[in-house]
Amino acid sequence: MTELPDNTRWQLWIVAFGFFMQSLDTTIVNTALPSMAKSLGESPLHMHMVVVSYVLTVAVMLPASGWLADKIGVRNIFFAAIVLFTLGSLFCALSGTLNQLVLARVLQGVGGAMMVPVGRLTVMKIVPRAQYMAAMTFVTLPGQIGPLLGPALGGVLVEYASWHWIFLINIPVGIVGAIATFMLMPNYTIETRRFDLPGFLLLAIGMAVLTLALDGSKSMGISPWTLAGLAAGGAAAILLYLLHAKKNSGALFSLRLFRTPTFSLGLLGSFAGRIGSGMLPFMTPVFLQIGLGFSPFHAGLMMIPMVLGSMGMKRIVVQIVNRFGYRRVLVATTLGLALVSLLFMSVALLGWYYLLPLVLLLQGMVNSARFSSMNTLTLKDLPDTLASSGNSLLSMIMQLSMSIGVTIAGMLLGMFGQQHIGIDSSATHHVFMYTWLCMAVIIALPAIIFARVPNDTQQNMVISRRKRSL
């Protein structure tokens, strides 16, 4: 990194800053949800829409971000992403109702969707290929620190200021980032093929409508017949996209991707797997505060061991997969995550709070091994010509499945609980216990998919510490 020109190093710092903002925002909000509910006069059972609106918007917008950067320029799009994210943060802080907050989170999600993929594209264009791995390690490190700081920082701001400050802190940082981007980042553009707008709209409508249909009766009071119509419309949009992609060589995502068996299995497993695991970062701080009566700051601190376990496991997961193979690792970690989630609930309800950090550390380790294995299984056998498209589709599916997971978690809470549930009461404990039992089943089900993964015939390359630091 020291051999790079000064202006290139500054550009990498700007990208790293964008990664940090986006990753921090994905975790800082969860700790504040109970306080937001109280301030807005809403039931905590409805607050999952604050998370879903952001993550679903990211999923919808991801396919367009790379094309926009190539067409309009990486500087212009990265600048627009930071501005939209910052404006969304301002509107979030000014929101006086849940509906206003959800709309502001959608605007934030549009900016967040463009930040990370455009940042990766920027690094590819400004750094020589020989230094690409070192540069990506540098810019993604803040993205790993964001989830570590997010829960605790969110807890501090909520407890000692107000929930509005989890959004207000983005404003001065966003202004500085936007100015630095405009002044220092080059505006690379390349010739692009025509954007598949019909395919993009079909996928966007399908994803949004199906997610809305999952929880519309609880959160929005939509009638069952209307929900059935929404579900049918969403499914029809997805089917129309498949027909469109079959006939169109320039489709957003080519159906040739699914000729690779490991990609099909991995994508299906990733979708199902992240529905279950996507519930945990949302449900855990909510349960700690509403179910156990923890303060926001205490609940935020309890999330740190989970992030530390996740970061630590990334260093050894390749060796584990090489030793035991994808099928065994994925089946074991899927079932293991379900068991650890039940262990967490058991330890919490028994009052053994001193064991909770250890259980959450274990949960983070198991979840990280599962995530890394799912990602590499999905992409490892794709031909070079389809690798970029496959990676984009996987990124979209990851965000979509997490939004569905949070939606289902909120739906389960609403099904087992009343309109308002009390803090640290016996009835509340039962609501969360039944919810966690259902979550454990949902988390375990993808093991059926992963049991079909073929035996491995190829070892994964392990990057030494020396190469990591180059």
UniProtKB/Swiss-Prot annotation:
<dbReference type="InterPro" id="IPR023721">
    <property type="entry name" value="Multi-R_MdtD"/>
</dbReference>
<dbReference type="Pfam" id="PF07690">
    <property type="entry name" value="MFS_1"/>
</dbReference>
<keyword id="KW-1003">Cell membrane</keyword>
<feature type="transmembrane region" description="Helical">
    <location>
        <begin position="342"/>
        <end position="362"/>
    </location>
</feature>
<dbReference type="GO" id="GO:0005886">
    <property type="term" value="C:plasma membrane"/>
</dbReference>
<feature type="topological domain" description="Cytoplasmic">
    <location>
        <begin position="33"/>
        <end position="48"/>
    </location>
</feature>
<dbReference type="GO" id="GO:0022857">
    <property type="term" value="F:transmembrane transporter activity"/>
</dbReference>
<keyword id="KW-0997">Cell inner membrane</keyword>
<feature type="topological domain" description="Periplasmic">
    <location>
        <begin position="243"/>
        <end position="262"/>
    </location>
</feature>
<keyword id="KW-0812">Transmembrane</keyword>
<comment type="similarity">
    <text>Belongs to the major facilitator superfamily. TCR/Tet family.</text>
</comment>
<dbReference type="InterPro" id="IPR020846">
    <property type="entry name" value="MFS_dom"/>
</dbReference>
<feature type="topological domain" description="Periplasmic">
    <location>
        <begin position="125"/>
        <end position="137"/>
    </location>
</feature>
<feature type="topological domain" description="Periplasmic">
    <location>
        <begin position="307"/>
        <end position="341"/>
    </location>
</feature>
<feature type="transmembrane region" description="Helical">
    <location>
        <begin position="222"/>
        <end position="242"/>
    </location>
</feature>
<feature type="transmembrane region" description="Helical">
    <location>
        <begin position="286"/>
        <end position="306"/>
    </location>
</feature>
<feature type="transmembrane region" description="Helical">
    <location>
        <begin position="77"/>
        <end position="97"/>
    </location>
</feature>
<feature type="transmembrane region" description="Helical">
    <location>
        <begin position="263"/>
        <end position="283"/>
    </location>
</feature>
<feature type="transmembrane region" description="Helical">
    <location>
        <begin position="396"/>
        <end position="416"/>
    </location>
</feature>
<feature type="topological domain" description="Periplasmic">
    <location>
        <begin position="1"/>
        <end position="11"/>
    </location>
</feature>
<feature type="transmembrane region" description="Helical">
    <location>
        <begin position="431"/>
        <end position="451"/>
    </location>
</feature>
<keyword id="KW-1133">Transmembrane helix</keyword>
<feature type="topological domain" description="Cytoplasmic">
    <location>
        <begin position="452"/>
        <end position="470"/>
    </location>
</feature>
<feature type="transmembrane region" description="Helical">
    <location>
        <begin position="12"/>
        <end position="32"/>
    </location>
</feature>
<feature type="topological domain" description="Periplasmic">
    <location>
        <begin position="70"/>
        <end position="76"/>
    </location>
</feature>
<keyword id="KW-0813">Transport</keyword>
<feature type="transmembrane region" description="Helical">
    <location>
        <begin position="165"/>
        <end position="185"/>
    </location>
</feature>
<protein>
    <recommendedName>
        <fullName>Putative multidrug resistance protein MdtD</fullName>
    </recommendedName>
</protein>
<feature type="topological domain" description="Periplasmic">
    <location>
        <begin position="186"/>
        <end position="196"/>
    </location>
</feature>
<feature type="transmembrane region" description="Helical">
    <location>
        <begin position="49"/>
        <end position="69"/>
    </location>
</feature>
<feature type="topological domain" description="Cytoplasmic">
    <location>
        <begin position="363"/>
        <end position="395"/>
    </location>
</feature>
<feature type="transmembrane region" description="Helical">
    <location>
        <begin position="197"/>
        <end position="217"/>
    </location>
</feature>
<feature type="topological domain" description="Periplasmic">
    <location>
        <begin position="417"/>
        <end position="430"/>
    </location>
</feature>
<feature type="topological domain" description="Cytoplasmic">
    <location>
        <begin position="218"/>
        <end position="221"/>
    </location>
</feature>
<feature type="topological domain" description="Cytoplasmic">
    <location>
        <begin position="284"/>
        <end position="285"/>
    </location>
</feature>
<dbReference type="InterPro" id="IPR011701">
    <property type="entry name" value="MFS"/>
</dbReference>
<feature type="topological domain" description="Cytoplasmic">
    <location>
        <begin position="159"/>
        <end position="164"/>
    </location>
</feature>
<feature type="transmembrane region" description="Helical">
    <location>
        <begin position="138"/>
        <end position="158"/>
    </location>
</feature>
<feature type="transmembrane region" description="Helical">
    <location>
        <begin position="102"/>
        <end position="124"/>
    </location>
</feature>
<dbReference type="InterPro" id="IPR036259">
    <property type="entry name" value="MFS_trans_sf"/>
</dbReference>
<feature type="topological domain" description="Cytoplasmic">
    <location>
        <begin position="98"/>
        <end position="101"/>
    </location>
</feature>
<keyword id="KW-0472">Membrane</keyword>
